[in-house]
Amino acid sequence: VWSLELAYGTPYLLSLGLSKEATGYVWIAGPLSGLIMQPVLGSLSDSSMSQFRRRKYMLGSCGVVALATCLIAFSEPISLYLLDIVGIGLGDWDPSRHKHAKRMTQVLSVLGFWILDFAINGLQVISRALILDHADASQQNEANAWHGRMLHAGSIIGYWCGWVDLSTWPSLAWIGGGQFRRFAVVSAVCMGICVSITCLFTPEYGTKHTTTSPEGLITRIGASVRQVVRVGRALPVPIQRVCLVELLATMSWFPFLFYSTTYVLDMAHRKHKRHSDADHELGSFAMLCFALLAMVSGLVLPSLSLAGKMRPPLLETLPPTSSSRRRVRGMSLRTLWTFGSFLQAV
């Protein structure tokens, strides 16, 4: 679903008649939803005493993501159906009906993307929390590494689905519409299958609290927000610096992730002078190459971080002035992160 939004979100909104400036107001839902949903929903699931403490939020977020995806994919037929109910327009030949249908489609699509961003951020934070719940302190680094690998693999599969021509698949003919609608339905179904497997085969156990009186939802949300603020103010200085760097890095990643396919489409339109699904598939192919490179980097670069894996006795056997000892000390995740940030800035 995330691949669907990144690869086809901006081109789809532009095809509905929204300007490039207006799409920026749509995508502001991404960081805004992450700022709100991830800490609040994570805190709510932490305080839950149910034996389904994480999974109930995961299933709820998954359901909302699926509904929002279908709302976006079928926004045009839904808008026509709503116009028929209200009785706007005399028929398909009425220009006023087309005008209202276009505006209604834009409203439903923008609303769907906002709901999708909030729900998918909730699904992401619950998934990460569920992984850490079942990993010991000694296994959390490995669990996070596998989480990153699965994200990269999902991105590759998602961008591949956006690259191939789904209109030629007979099994998807019942969906109707173009490439975007079929890609949306496929991504929603795959997400539902993966979340269902996770919820069925991941056990949880309820937590016990000393409080005997149940609190209301609004009270729990307020307490969660206050807790997040307190934790944020008490962060160590090195962690605050990392957060500041990530803030600035995200500002540069934002236009790349959401507008890279549009950039590829603009170059294709200058050459072909026309719009088609093939151009959108070309944008997905560009993101597929990006996902493949990210997968390779995620697998190779951590293994190059020798300083965190070299045992101290082995390090001490090297001569203090040897070049090998200096290289081992210098090759760390922090060094790779700094070098990656520099390349991103360039």
Q: How should each PLM-predicted stretch be described?
A:
Residues 11, 128-134, 262:
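Intracellular helix-loop hinge segments at the cytoplasmic ends of transmembrane helices
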Residues 12, 19-29, 145-146, 178-182, ...:
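Loop-to-transmembrane helix entry
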Residues 59-102, 339-346:
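C-terminal ends and interior cores of transmembrane alpha-helices
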Residues 96-109, 114, 122-123, 127-128, ...:
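Intracellular loop-helix junctions on the cytosolic face of multi-pass helical membrane proteins
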Residues 58-68, 112, 186-187, 194, ...:
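Residue-level signature of the transmembrane alpha-helical cores
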Residues 1-33, 238-274:
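Helix-loop boundary and gating motifs at the non-cytosolic
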Residues 35-52, 166, 295-335:
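Helix-to-loop junctions at the C-terminal end of transmembrane segments
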Residues 23-48, 61-74, 152-160, 288-303:
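Central cavity-lining transmembrane alpha-helices of secondary-active solute carriers
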